[in-house]
């Protein structure tokens, strides 16, 4: 059945405008993004089918171009549109932490870092560079590695911190395994970076380890 033949209150776009986006199911939200269905399926039916094929909305949003375009009803144009939505989301979250004290808005910082790192298939090491008021100057992935490790060089962290005239930094990296519990290697590299940046009067304020649905803070555990 075409969406136009559904009662107005059942059409995703009209439902969103009347009740807000939180009232919609994942399939209804995806249907608005898709706009149209395929032969024999309206946009909601196609969205429901795609969610079952991908396994979840998150997996669909984090898929690469080849995987995305291999599904019927999706193509390069939709992939480009999706990447624009994802990038706007990341910039929105970065602006939120950029305008606030990174220490007094830890939830925004955690949300941003989770969005940046959680769905990566390889380990990535991310640094937030802060000024002396703990406002964000820049965020950058400095190192990327294999599925279970990234080579991290303290001297490069020092160099980039000086480049951005940072007074403090926040470290973060993901565990592609999904388990956020920090390893002994994580604790050792944090100590090495802390010692290195302290030589140029820069502090490490925290190190977050991002898992699947969990984030561990070194500062909250008293390790920094």
UniProtKB/Swiss-Prot annotation:
Domain MPN: 102-224
Keyword set includes Metal-binding: yes
Keyword Hydrolase: yes
Residue positions binding Zn(2+): 173, 175, 186
GO biological process: proteolysis
Domain of life (superkingdom): Bacteria
Keyword annotations of the record: Hydrolase, Metal-binding, Metalloprotease, Protease, Zinc
Any one GO molecular function term: metal ion binding
Pfam families for the chain: RadC, UPF0758_N
Motif annotated as JAMM motif, chain positions: 173-186
Family: Belongs to the UPF0758 family.
Protein name per the record: UPF0758 protein VFMJ11_0123
Native source species: Aliivibrio fischeri (strain MJ11) (Vibrio fischeri)
């Amino acid at each position: 059945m075409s969406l136009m033949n559904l009662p107005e209150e059942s059409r995703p776009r009209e439902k969103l405008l009347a009740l807000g986006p939180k009232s919609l199911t994942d399939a209804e939200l995806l249907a608005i993004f898709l706009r149209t269905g395929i032969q024999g399926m309206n946009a909601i039916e196609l969205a429901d089918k795609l969610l079952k094929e991908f396994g979840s909305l998150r997996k669909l949003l984090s898929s690469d171009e080849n995987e995305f375009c291999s599904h019927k009803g999706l193509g390069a144009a939709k992939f480009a549109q999706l990447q624009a939505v994802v990038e706007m989301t990341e910039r929105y979250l970065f602006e939120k932490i950029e305008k606030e004290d990174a220490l007094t808005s830890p939830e925004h910082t955690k949300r941003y870092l989770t969005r940046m790192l959680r769905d990566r298939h390889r380990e990535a090491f991310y640094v937030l560079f802060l000024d002396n008021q703990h406002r964000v100057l820049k965020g950058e992935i400095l190192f990327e590695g294999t599925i279970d490790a990234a080579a991290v060089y303290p001297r490069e962290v020092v160099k980039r911190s000086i480049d951005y005239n940072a007074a403090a930094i926040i470290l973060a990296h993901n565990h592609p395994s999904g388990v956020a519990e920090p390893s002994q290697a994580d604790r050792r590299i944090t100590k090495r970076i802390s010692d290195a940046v302290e030589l140029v009067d820069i502090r490490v304020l925290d190190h977050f380890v991002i898992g699947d649905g969990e984030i561990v803070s070194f500062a909250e555990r008293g390790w920094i």
